[in-house]
């Protein structure tokens, strides 16, 4: 049995928006549940690396907050998400560091991912200093080449 150190299944599937709108956001397909577990394991590795970075640079708390993980089709439609969103597959999360070092986290994550397979790393809605509002991390896409290794910025 695989042990997950930092992230829970509930954390990757909960949604305040779904609760408020009374939308069922529980994944039904086993493949989606497996994807979420794979994402949890990947995020555990990210957290381990970020913990070391925070210790070395004196950044403080290395916790990573999941703002959005898996989204059911109904939830994705309600928030006007992309029809091809990796959140629908359970292979993406919008995350940010609890310590507020969003820019440093994004830059560190880009370097951390440089020798790994992933789909997308997106700096979402950065401020004038380049600090993302959050970071989107997709580990596996739905395309012929699921590991696109794209690093993008959405303004």
Regions found by a protein language model. Name each.
Residues 59-61, 88-92:
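Short connector loops at helix/strand junctions that flank enzyme active sites
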Residues 44-80:
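Extended, low-complexity, intrinsically disordered C-terminal regulatory tails
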Residues 35, 39-42, 75, 91, ...:
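Amphipathic alpha-helical interface surfaces
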Residues 1-59, 130, 148-155:
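Extracytoplasmic cell-surface/polysaccharide-interacting catalytic and binding patches
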Residues 11, 16, 74, 79, ...:
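Solvent-exposed, flexible loop/coil residues
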Residues 64, 93, 135:
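A broad, low-specificity signal marking well-ordered, structured residues that form hydrophobic/aromatic
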Residues 84, 89, 97-155:
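Catalytic cores and adjacent binding grooves of peptidoglycan-active enzymes
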């Amino acid at each position: 049995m695989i042990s997950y150190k930092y992230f829970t299944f509930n954390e990757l599937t909960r949604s305040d928006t779904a609760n408020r709108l009374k939308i069922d956001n529980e994944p039904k397909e086993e493949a989606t549940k497996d994807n979420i577990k794979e994402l949890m394991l990947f995020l555990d590795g990210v957290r381990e690396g970020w913990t070391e970075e925070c210790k070395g640079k004196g950044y403080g708390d290395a916790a990573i907050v999941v703002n959005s993980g898996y989204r059911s089709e109904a939830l994705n439609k309600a928030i006007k998400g992309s029809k091809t969103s990796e959140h629908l597959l359970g292979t993406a999360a919008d995350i940010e560091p609890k310590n507020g070092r969003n820019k440093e986290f994004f830059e560190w994550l880009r370097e951390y991912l440089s020798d790994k397979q992933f789909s997308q790393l997106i700096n979402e809605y950065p401020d004038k200093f380049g600090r993302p509002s959050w970071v989107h991390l997709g580990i596996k896409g739905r395309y012929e080449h699921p590991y696109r290794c794209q690093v993008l910025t959405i303004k």
